[in-house]
Amino acid sequence: MYEEEIKKIALLNAYQHNGKAELKSVIGKVMAEIADLRKNPKLVSELAKAAVDSVNSMSKDDIVNIVEKQFPEALKKDKKPEEHRLPDLQGVNGHVVMRLAPSPSGPLHIGHTRMAILNDEYVKRYGGDLILRIEDTNPTNIDPEAYAMIPEDLEWLGVNVTKTVIQSERFDLYYSVAKKLIENGHLYICTCDREEFKRKKLASIPCKDRDNPPETNLYLFEKMLDGEIKAGAAVAVMKTDLNHPNPSVRDWIAFRIIDAKHPRTGDKYRVFPMMSFSVAVDDHYLGLTHVLRGKDQLTNTEKQRYVFEYNGWNKPYYYHYGMIRFPGTRLKTSLMKKGIQAGQYDGWSDVRLGTVRAMARRGYQPETFRRYWINSGLREIDAVFSWEIFNSLNREFVDPKAYRFSFTKDPVEIKMEGSNGLTARLPYHPSHPEYGVRKYEIGDTVYISKGDADKIADGERFRLKDLCYVVRKGDRFLFDGTEMKEKTKIINWCPPNSREFQVLKPDGSIDKGLIEPASKGYRGISQLERYGYVNFYDSDEKAYFTHD
């Protein structure tokens, strides 16, 4: 049913890669384009392998002829890719005001990029403001460096923030709103034991302080602010519905006392608002029109409804998207921070982490994040993040600019008997002759990877890519000319003056080998031929693995 469509993908891939289809690239493209197959990766692998094997048995000329005759539309440079459009927002009246609301516990990670990009896309569509609101109302969970790292990450992603607000600078506003709610009987001060309060709430029983008059509650709130009440001895509680089906929504805590210095305000404040209170107040006073958030915030949305209704405020439009699971990716900020402090990681950009800056170091492009989340949209169903699709998208952005180099992992030296000297002229990019070539004068010695060497059978003829043919005779390697006699395996190689090189991978492993001299001084994304894409970030001696 899908064989012809997958073969077309394999043919186009081979056309783009000098006549050889790359299996992993084809699998990624199939997963990205054929939605019905995404739930059956085993079938995708089988069908893609069959298509790649078939295409790779064809000559380059045959592939070019087929693609140019049968799929000319795919070759048009001005052909636009399939456009995925986010659904329209309801209730838009001229422009929108939207927000990003991270906690400054660390830099942004890949999970944060969804809310950043979706909000940015809507503000671009309708015009208006995108507010960065740093929610730093928990002084015990703040990394002071995050105040700078978060805007840096957003700038790298291409997100256009028009205004920045820091919640720790708005405590007087929160206190003012709280006092008004106390005066109107919607907020009370509870001095019950914490566990007793929790038990009563679960049983829908009011605590002893619930019906205290506003005057008493105002007096106690002022004593909390003045430092006359100890931490844990009193909290300010939003009066809701004790019979609400969700116990979390019943009389929820709006303020608590924390005796800890805040990185920005020091000990100026000791009564800190809980997230649902400060968020609702800010959403009103900042003029939010639309809020995008995960389904995990549905309970908080319901809690915040009381703040809006008690104050007579209009609520923004809320959209709750499904949760995304990121398999095999370290995203929990507290654990990443502990690992950094323990020396397990070399900082927030360590490629073993899932932070935005680690992804940038590996070579992922800002456009990849944007395309992926636009394609995912605002769906309410939970999903698993697809690294195959993500990598396939990134490959589209990096491949045209990725210079090609040769890397031999665990190198083995081979001497070609009968070689009188060869000249290799290797293009930096098979589709961009304007990038130039690497030129090497080869005597009789090259290096290949141990993995390739171990697979060469006695008597087998193989091709050193873009150089010559060689026949193995026991432990000897015999030069066998440059003319193709039959289809043979192609092996990557490095010249004798190659240098030692390492590729650092996100699973913590390191591949060591040799890399060709022409890579010296190169910075940016490269494709190490028949190995994968890497990012030459800051060194000639190492690169960071991006993906296959």
From Swiss-Prot:
It catalyses: tRNA(Glu) + L-glutamate + ATP = L-glutamyl-tRNA(Glu) + AMP + diphosphate. Signal peptide: none annotated. Its EC number is 6.1.1.17. Coiled coil: none annotated. InterPro entries: aa-tRNA-synth_I_CS, Gln/Glu-tRNA_Ligase, Glu-tRNA-synth_arc/euk, Glu/Gln-tRNA-synth, Glu/Gln-tRNA-synth_Ib_cat-dom, Glu/Gln-tRNA-synth_Ib_codon-bd, Rbsml_bL25/Gln-tRNA_synth_N, Ribosomal_bL25/Gln-tRNA_synth. A motif ('HIGH' region) lies at residues 102-112. It is found in: Cytoplasm. Belongs to the class-I aminoacyl-tRNA synthetase family. Glutamate--tRNA ligase type 2 subfamily. PANTHER family: GLUTAMATE--TRNA LIGASE, GLUTAMINE-TRNA LIGASE. Catalyzes the attachment of glutamate to tRNA(Glu) in a two-step reaction: glutamate is first activated by ATP to form Glu-AMP and then transferred to the acceptor end of tRNA(Glu). NCBIfam families: gltX_arch, PRK04156.1. This is Glutamate--tRNA ligase. It comes from Thermoplasma volcanium (strain ATCC 51530 / DSM 4299 / JCM 9571 / NBRC 15438 / GSS1). The gene is gltX.
